[in-house]
From Swiss-Prot:
<keyword id="KW-0528">Neurotoxin</keyword>
<feature type="disulfide bond">
    <location>
        <begin position="75"/>
        <end position="153"/>
    </location>
</feature>
<keyword id="KW-0108">Calcium channel impairing toxin</keyword>
<dbReference type="InterPro" id="IPR003582">
    <property type="entry name" value="ShKT_dom"/>
</dbReference>
<keyword id="KW-0800">Toxin</keyword>
<feature type="disulfide bond">
    <location>
        <begin position="92"/>
        <end position="165"/>
    </location>
</feature>
<feature type="disulfide bond">
    <location>
        <begin position="209"/>
        <end position="227"/>
    </location>
</feature>
<dbReference type="InterPro" id="IPR001283">
    <property type="entry name" value="CRISP-related"/>
</dbReference>
<comment type="function">
    <text>Blocks contraction of smooth muscle elicited by high potassium-induced depolarization, but does not block caffeine-stimulated contraction. May target voltage-gated calcium channels on smooth muscle.</text>
</comment>
<feature type="disulfide bond">
    <location>
        <begin position="218"/>
        <end position="231"/>
    </location>
</feature>
<keyword id="KW-1015">Disulfide bond</keyword>
<dbReference type="GO" id="GO:0005576">
    <property type="term" value="C:extracellular region"/>
</dbReference>
<comment type="similarity">
    <text>Belongs to the CRISP family.</text>
</comment>
<feature type="domain" description="SCP">
    <location>
        <begin position="38"/>
        <end position="164"/>
    </location>
</feature>
<dbReference type="InterPro" id="IPR018244">
    <property type="entry name" value="Allrgn_V5/Tpx1_CS"/>
</dbReference>
<dbReference type="InterPro" id="IPR014044">
    <property type="entry name" value="CAP_dom"/>
</dbReference>
<dbReference type="Pfam" id="PF08562">
    <property type="entry name" value="Crisp"/>
</dbReference>
Length: 238
């Protein structure tokens, strides 16, 4: 069977002073800034070009935020262990940003998204080897649970972390993080402002679950346990 391989990447360290803010005022513990973070992500997901027919709306998740806070508090410019990045049945992806000065959350998210300049739709990174993983995670179609946190590690070191569940950046699909087409084309009866609102509560273990399910009709317990999204999430984004 073919297991999913998740790719991770780290943001470059920023030294410039433009866009800096008071760190305490931007705490992700505050409801207003949680909304800012979610709205920024959804605005970027909604505005992708070409448009997406299967892009899910993101929502704040307190467990993902707790995990992100633990990751940020390590004050290490490295991804947290995979086993610490889970929410329920989902494995979660992670974006990390480090700066010498505090930044507004909207600026942090925009910096990740700006890797789009190195992306060619359907091809992937151009030139080859360019960092694009933060952008692709932000626009990964089925990542719909979001939690973020920050840490002041010293007077010249600030870490910002967001976790995304289920994880994006599956290596075999990195060039196509979403399905292009009319907005909400795959969710016409579950659409809010250009984003789908019908996520699947399960995650498949294997990348060839569609073929396995077609062959077995999802009649065996093994298939149901390994391919629950394909077997049970009809009329949902999987």
């Amino acid at each position: 069977m073919i297991a999913f391989i998740v790719l991770l990447s780290l943001a470059a360290v920023l030294q410039q002073s433009s866009g800096t803010v008071d760190f305490a005022s931007e705490s992700s513990n505050k409801k207003d800034y949680r909304r800012e973070i979610v709205d920024k992500h959804n605005a970027l997901r909604r505005s992708v070009k070409p448009t997406a027919r299967n892009m899910l709306q993101m929502k704040w998740n307190s467990r993902a935020a707790q995990n992100a806070k633990r990751s940020a508090d390590r004050c290490t410019f490295a991804h947290s262990p995979e086993h610490t990045r889970t929410v329920g049945k989902f494995r979660c992806g992670e974006n990390i940003f480090m700066s010498s000065q505090p930044f507004a959350w909207s600026g942090v998210v925009q910096d990740w998204y700006d890797e789009i300049k190195n992306v060619v739709d359907g091809i992937g990174a151009k030139p080859p080897g360019s960092v694009i993983g933060h952008y692709t995670q932000i626009v990964w179609y089925k990542s719909h649970l979001l939690g973020c946190a920050s840490a002041k590690c010293s007077s010249t070191k600030y870490l910002y972390v967001c976790q995304y569940c289920p994880a994006g950046n599956i290596s075999s699909s990195i060039a196509t993080p979403y399905k292009s087409g009319p907005s909400c084309g795959d969710c016409p009866s579950a659409c809010v402002n250009g984003l789908c609102t019908n996520p699947c509560e399960y995650e498949d273990t294997f990348s060839n679950c569609k073929a396995l399910a077609k062959k077995t009709k999802c009649k065996t317990e093994w298939i149901k346990s390994k391919c629950p999204a394909t077997c049970f999430c009809h009329n949902k984004i999987i």
